[in-house]
Amino acid sequence: MTDAIEINRRNWDERAIIHSRDTTGDYMLDRMRAGEDALHAIEATELGEIGGKRVLHLQCHIGRDTLCLVRRGAIATGLDFSGEALRTARHLAQESGLKANFVQGRIEEASRLTPGPFDLAFSTWGTICWLPDLRVWAQAIAAVLVPGGELYLADAHPGFQVMELRDDRLEPTYDFQTPVERPLEFSDETTYTGDPTIMTHQTTRE
């Protein structure tokens, strides 16, 4: 599993550099720097009032959403395993005039690395598919929350995630549960934002 994590880290380090340029506008970084809220409508609606709440953003990547939480009044910490992503996150915070704490590490290290406890853990879009054990993930989150603290999770339904589009039809392709010792391997030349940059580290494991 360590090998899979390192393979993924190299891929996400490279993606972070590409995403920091945001050539396609997929991450809305220019709009975010200009003061706009870059959260999706579903998150913005469901989160409610978070002013003054201590929030831990898990797998925060380049920190855009972490900073959106700060803009909404939260005291936010972003946690991610990619050093390149966090370099971008800190730079984006400086550019935006927003204060957030960014910590490099894995979720199971959160209680040791982050300044908890927290009122809310926040995790959205394409996160849990990368995790080898959701029980460990849940225990790590519980360990950093105050009594009565909450987890906000927004992601695609697992029933959708097992599908692939083939000949304009969605077909079941993957097992609903992937064995930890046999992660799925994928290879993509480019990242998901539409930027045409060809990546060196193209392989990921989920």
Describe the role of every protein-language-model region:
Residues M1-D26:
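N-terminal, positively charged/glycine-rich alpha-helical extensions of SAM-dependent methyltransferases
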Residues T24-K53:
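Conserved alpha-helix/loop element of class I SAM-dependent methyltransferases that forms part
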Residues R54-A110:
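Class I SAM-dependent methyltransferase SAM/SAH-binding core
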Residues R112-A121:
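A short acidic, Gly/Pro-enriched loop at the edge of an enzyme's catalytic core
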Residues S123-W125, A154:
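Residues lining the SAM
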Residues R135-E150:
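A short glycine-rich, Lys/Arg-flanked "PGG" loop and its adjoining helix->strand segment in the class I
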Residues E150-E189:
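Conserved class I S-adenosyl-L-methionine
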Residues M199-E206:
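Short alpha-helix
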